[in-house]
């Protein structure tokens, strides 16, 4: 059983360690983030996304690749070299495994594309004319084609970054899809997601590839869509998307699971709930505890540094307890009255189990 971050950290207090706005400042921030993760017992460790909190720089660099369909090499090479350089710096600061998180192609493909108008918006704009409605439908089809092209181009650009990280020795690469909850039952969207992730992952050798579903529940897309590509593990946010438990239950037992259960909010989940989530995930598909980890439910960038450190400590402590055999220490750490069947059934204490 292990614990890891599935999102970013707030900026640690730096003091006079480095001048603001310099490369030295970013290096110092990353080191402080790594030391805090080590102290909390987390592994694999991340750079806390302190260099590129929302993947904005990486998205811009890869946008050059996706811009006109010709996949120019300059933006892709820069994305690869800067990402590898950042991972190598973080990995050189600790003897623990360091993973690299990347944005997913489906989410990137939605950037900069206007969302379809609602029916009421169309009615107001088009005043009910048949020709106007047909024009809007054509625009939506063109928008969908453009987004599909961009998504696949982003998948190609990300594939280059993944291969560069693999060549550098990165042991674990996490692909985060924030918009997978928007797929639903749309067959075209499901196909686009599957095609993009196959383009990104098939034939990659070396690192452990993990798909992270954040921002909501992607269960509506179906396990056949989310689990189609050959990822070695699946991470899910169970606070923003409790129905992601259905994906956990349908994930084959030879794949790992990271359950995101410690959210970036004021109230902490009881330790007993975290242990319940870890052991339930371990029970699905005959998976066992060695293929299960506890994770943050999203990131902690919205918190104070002190609060984020407390959340990481909670994660690390829960993973340590979840790995324990029955013992006096474990018994002392748990409150048997913290979960009632009635409260759990109402969803007050535990993440909802999967529907059958």
PLM segments and residue spans:
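Domain-level signal for soluble alpha/beta catalytic cores
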Residues: 1-356
